[in-house]
């Protein structure tokens, strides 16, 4: 599966129906909101200036499994809240306001769905890395490869400009992050991360056999 398909996979009709019931919103509006939010999150993650933060976010959530009970886990995860604050920052308010207005849902509902979209995006990136044996630079390259697809993911009437991502497709001028050892797939119980904090240029994904 492609990176985008891995992210979209858990955002299925069952989750949309469950979210609509919990949030008191219509399924069609929840679907439109998630259809706007996950490309927005992916777009922010793919921005050149966010490279180091994205790798740190993957490390921060490396032991978390959002593949099941995504709605509940994302909503109750302090790690996801921290990542939204750190990576999306002030841009999150811009995104939430436009998505809330565009989809006619409450801003509090949009906030909850942003957590879901962020968790799904991180989980999709981790799965893509595991399946393809990607190191840090490989992950960033994969994100860069998918930038051009993001505008087409947005629902009709929503644009990169609405989400504050008008510069997303500009050419990358950042210095690449130094590669680390490839990520090999292991079960969640086997995952053990060693992050070398004494080096800002490298981080290592290691798994206990």
Q: Which residues are covered by each model-predicted region?
A:
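A structural "flexibility-hinge" signal
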Residues: 1-209
